[in-house]
């Protein structure tokens, strides 16, 4: 718009619900969750079923702690295998709940991953997994917009392009739209005498 990029849309891999209506016992509490794939396997958890409170900067440390415990327990207890790829574990836990900004977002999340980290964005693969879950539950149709908000207020727009199959699973093709800002410019040089100027391969 007026010579400026206002958004970038990508079409993601097939997303699908792997297992639904699961529970895991964490510190004596049974927590319901769903395993869905959106590029990685996610455990999706409804925060209204928990007693931590709304998703915001103050509660994120508690969600991180719970998410790490859940991820470890789920991978110990649930056999996971992508139907066509060599992916065999839940990598991320996605907590979702009401947004305090319903005028510009549908729902809010915090995605826990890695070494006790929280995604500052709504997570593209996580948004894809959420779209697949909502579609499976009959809560969103093809072409309908879903605006996912992170705990710091950044948003992604998700739309289901079409339905498909992945192995024996009903799946959807998600389209994710987001924005970014230019923060710097770099210059890379090739020295003709550099023996590794074109890189190298291992294995």
Residue ranges and their predicted role:
Residues 1-203:
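Active-site proximal loop and beta-alpha junction motif in alpha/beta enzyme cores
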